[in-house]
Amino acid sequence: VADWTSGVPAFYRHATGRNRFDFQLQKTAPGEDYHIIAVSDPQTHTDAHFAKFAGEPVADMAKTAGEFDGAAVGLVLGDISWDRIEILDMYRKEIVRVGIPFYPVVGNHDNQASLQGDSAASAAYRSKMGPENYAFCIGKDVVIVLDNIIYGTNFKCTIGYTDEVIRWVENLLPLLPTDACLYVAQHSPLNHEGNGLVNEDALLALLRGRNVNFLSGH
């Protein structure tokens, strides 16, 4: 597993101006068994809110993780903050206390509402937490993290997958074992308020025939 002592697993590198990429890896427990802790929507806005999250919830997760045998990872399924981007720095500092790598998912409240457009609104998130779309292996299985928040501006967003995300999944799947269990980790559930998501049918068509579990919050 990539080094995660910064609060976010360092499995990625910024490519601009570089032609060599070195990664510090840590050996995981042997065997194919694993555990996943999935949490969502801490939605902390004030320092007092965050102190509550960093108290009993983090302590409980650390206790649970300490009882695991074998590999273990955590997923935080979006809305780490409530429209306060500096909370992400506080989160990174505290989540390492759980004792396992925690992988983030972007939520609608992790965007900057004052900016216009999906990429601009999530730029600060990317700088602190890494890419919005990525995948990693655990045991023989694979976790696929997707951004299904298409942000506009001023708290307005569309739920679904951009064409770019769909193309990324399409290119990823041939690289994955067909017998692997896939966990799709995303912020909004598939059936959002009784409505389908933008490009939902395209995603499900790509995943057809696979063993898939969706993990979400919102």
Question: Each predicted region: which residue ranges?
Answer:
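Surface-exposed cleft-lining segments at the edges of enzyme active sites
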Residues: T44-T46, D79-I80, I150-G160, N191-H192
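Active-site glycine-centered loops adjacent to acidic/histidine catalytic or metal-binding residues
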Residues: D41, G78-D79, G107-N108, H187, ...
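Long, structured stretches of catalytic cores involved in phosphate-ester chemistry, encompassing
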Residues: D179-A185, P189-H218
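N-terminal active-site segment of His-dependent metallophosphoesterases
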Residues: W4-V8, Y12-D89
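Active-site-proximal beta-strand elements of phosphoester/diester hydrolases
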Residues: D33-T44, K140-I150, Y183-H187
